[in-house]
Amino acid sequence: MLSQWPRWVAQDKELPAMPIAKPLGFEVGDYVVYPKHGVGRVVELQSSEIAGSFLELFVLRFEKERMTLRVPTNKAEAVGMRKLSSQATLTEALTTLKGKPRIKRTMWSRRAQEYEAKINSGDLVSIAEVVRDLHRAEDQPEQSYSERQIYEAAIGRLARELAAMENIDEPAAQLKIEQVLKAA
């Protein structure tokens, strides 16, 4: 009767050994950026049978969120997974922070969607734009709750990538970002 079960039902059988490729140049121990979750680390390259087909997977660990994510190696590029930004991109992002904030006169709900899209794009310069636009100096009026939430998400993403790139801890990276913002 078991032979009539659908193929997707888990079976206790040994998976054949498969050579695991290193597409996109990611290796175990590398820091990577996954657009919706930020900076994570490749902790394992895994081969699994799912729905009757074999998949090679990157196993990513996001310490801040205490989350593990498995990404098929053939889908990594399509979902926007990338290596940490280059030094030139980091310099451009820090320069963006020094720029004048763009105050848009559109409804907050529309701006909030735009800011969320920029944060989830994973692009360091776009995230820096959100931080710059939502940053409030001490002499400026306070932010609304939702504005503060988006600002915290953006500065957190920026700080995590900066910390991974410069091999410093996240609070030190956040302090560096805040110093750049105050100097602007």
Model region roles, listed by residue range:
Residues 59-61, 65-74:
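A short macromolecule-binding patch
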Residues 40-42:
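Conserved hydrophobic positions within beta-strands
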Residues 48-59:
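Short, solvent-exposed secondary-structure boundary/capping segments
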Residues 2-28:
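Mixed-charge, Lys/Arg-rich low-complexity intrinsically disordered regions
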Residues 30, 44-46:
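Short, well-ordered turn and helix-capping elements at secondary-structure junctions
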Residues 74, 78-184:
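Charge/polar-rich, low-complexity and marginally structured segments
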Residues 37, 55-57, 68:
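Broad gene-expression machinery/nucleic-acid interaction feature
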